[in-house]
């Protein structure tokens, strides 16, 4: 490791020791941050996998039920049932700070005013069968899970990026900056000791 190109003076030695102390403290803080991010990241990956499996399973089941329910209806009538959607939702995003990483928090709110005017679904109960009503309701209930999945996946992506950045900073301090400072400090201490010995020898020669 190449040492820093500085003059071997006591002032430089003091400055370098302060820099080393700061770098060592920063290294510990960054390692702690990386470890905590990794712990949360693993938890989120687990949640992501469980959510995805649940959603895919429920969507597949709902689609199967919907196809069966649709089979008993006239195709033109089914198209008319969904021609005018009335289910409206408001989506907004907040930002949450997790270990200095800004991640999204999705919120959804149903706008029930129009639904109350025209009925719960975009079609009439009188025109559809109960199986179709049931599958549509189940699909609506999946909305929050889908938003949570999107939230978790985006959070995982942002955390992964920050973990990589933090890892590079930790490695930079651990394998480059701190060793370089330590080697330079050692070099200056040796030079100062040599200068002190040389000065002592000169004094002894003068007094002898």
Swiss-Prot record:
InterPro entries: V_ATPase_D. GO terms for molecular function: ATP binding; proton-transporting ATP synthase activity, rotational mechanism; proton-transporting ATPase activity, rotational mechanism. GO terms for biological process: proton motive force-driven plasma membrane ATP synthesis. Transmembrane segments: none annotated. Keywords: ATP synthesis, Hydrogen ion transport, Ion transport, Transport. Signal peptide: none annotated. Produces ATP from ADP in the presence of a proton gradient across the membrane. Belongs to the V-ATPase D subunit family. This is V-type ATP synthase subunit D. The gene is atpD.
